[in-house]
Amino acid sequence: MSSGVHWKLHWETELASSDHEELASFFRNTYGPTGKFNAKPFEDGRSWAGARPELRAIAYDSKGIAGHLGLLRRFIRVGETEVLVAELGLYGVRPDLEKLGIAHSIRAMAPVVDDLGVPFAFGTVRYAMRNHIERFCRDGAANIVSGIRVESTLADVYRDCPATRTEDVLVVVVPVGRTMSDWPSGSLIQRRGPEL
């Protein structure tokens, strides 16, 4: 990101209502251009779409919030193996700063992820983001794992809809306390909750 941007880590309990309102506006403006439905969860000052993060890396510049990455520790099931991960999600960069940031947000979060004692950081992205993520993975700090379906619960329950969904997405794995060879094999990841 540009030199005028600085990152700050916030535990969820440190954020005030005004922070959530500012983040909600950021997400509506960032996700809205990708489809009205994508901005809907952020109405009424809500700053999360599915699971609520416990830690956030937030980038600021002279215009306000410039970028965001959320983190939530959780167990997921990969094939037949339970794995503790730091799920990374709710990634966004203000449209005027696009193409300048995912590596910076991960690096801002890295020292805390190390302290959390998790073996892996994990996230999912749409296939449309593949080129963007591949650039981030070039130095080997993260790995794209394709051909895996991911099952999640829906953030809200509706009488006429299933309670879960299974998606074919790109899985991004960042080894933290282990090596990539320790990541279990399997064609299905069960999140056991809503995505971050």
UniProtKB/Swiss-Prot annotation:
N-acyltransferase required for nodulation. Acts in the production of a small, heat-stable compound (Nod) that stimulates mitosis in various plant protoplasts. One of its GO terms (cellular component) is cytosol. One of its GO terms (molecular function) is acyltransferase activity. It comes from the Bacteria. Keywords: Acyltransferase, Cytoplasm, Nodulation, Transferase. This is Nodulation protein A. The keyword Plastid does not apply. The gene is nodA.
